[in-house]
Amino acid sequence: MAYDMAQKMAARGMWVPDLAMAGGFSTEDHIFKVLAMGSPYFKAVCMGRALMIPGMVGKNVEKWLKENNLPKTVSQHGASKEEIFVCYEELKAKYGKDAESFPLGAIGLYTFSQKIKVGLQQIMAGSRNFRIDTISRSDLMALTEEAAKISGIPYVMDAYKEEAEKILLEGCDYI
């Protein structure tokens, strides 16, 4: 509905503010889909619980390390903060000894943020989008006819059909 309202405002020449979407998003594919479905109006994705969890896990790991009581689910990945947090060495290289005083909750949050960043970059590269503002609704297709009808995103069996037929019938100059 927000996208439809923004479309109507734009069609009337009204100013459309940058919009943000919230609602249980937790992974990079969620972020990509929100930005694509809301393009060009949605510029941000709000994440609440998804960001709190790695912070709380990091805080718990810090407590367990101090108590020398790491659960097996954590100790299978390492026995120190350097081994458990994949981005710890990066922070240590950037901030030196100061990184040793960083709360592990913050390091957990940073590590999760880096995972989101790299994953989003990979999805964007795969879809040939090298800037956030180039992501668009044309980067998506609906898996069901009902989803296509509701969203206005082309159904998977129809998406890029004309382009494919043109290549088949007329050939392709660049291959």
Predicted regions and their residues:
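Glycine-rich phosphate/ribose-binding loops and adjacent secondary-structure elements
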Residues: M1-F85
